[in-house]
């Protein structure tokens, strides 16, 4: 978080990749992968950001994963992919995530 706050995205990316490589815990790995994907998205590395989301294994993060994937796909111009991701988030998310997914679907 500190590197992102300082807009040192390269250091943030390296730290998160290291955390993913060293973690034996699916929840920690999933959280680090979500943050890594967000950092890569921030830098315009859309394909890398989508690839990082493949490391999210914990089911508890599936809606957050789908919401972020949808945002990345929108930025890439993949409206159909974004729609599918947001619809998946609606199926697996908590009430707030479902509402957010619906808002994003409405904005497509």
Regions found by a protein language model. Give the residues of each.
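Alpha-helical adaptor scaffolds
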Residues: 1-63, 69-72
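TPR/TPR-like (Sel1-like) alpha-helical repeat modules
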Residues: 57-59, 73-96, 106
């Amino acid at each position: 978080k500190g590197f992102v706050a300082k807009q040192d995205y390269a250091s943030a990316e390296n730290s998160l990749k290291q955390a993913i490589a060293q973690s034996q815990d699916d929840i920690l790995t999933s959280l680090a992968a979500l943050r890594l994907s967000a950092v890569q998205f921030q830098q315009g590395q859309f394909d890398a950001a989508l690839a990082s989301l493949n490391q999210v294994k914990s089911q508890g993060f599936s809606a957050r994963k789908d919401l972020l994937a949808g945002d990345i796909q929108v930025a890439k111009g993949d409206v159909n992919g974004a729609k599918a991701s947001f619809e998946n988030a609606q199926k697996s998310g908590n009430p707030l995530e479902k509402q957010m997914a619906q808002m994003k679907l409405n904005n497509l």
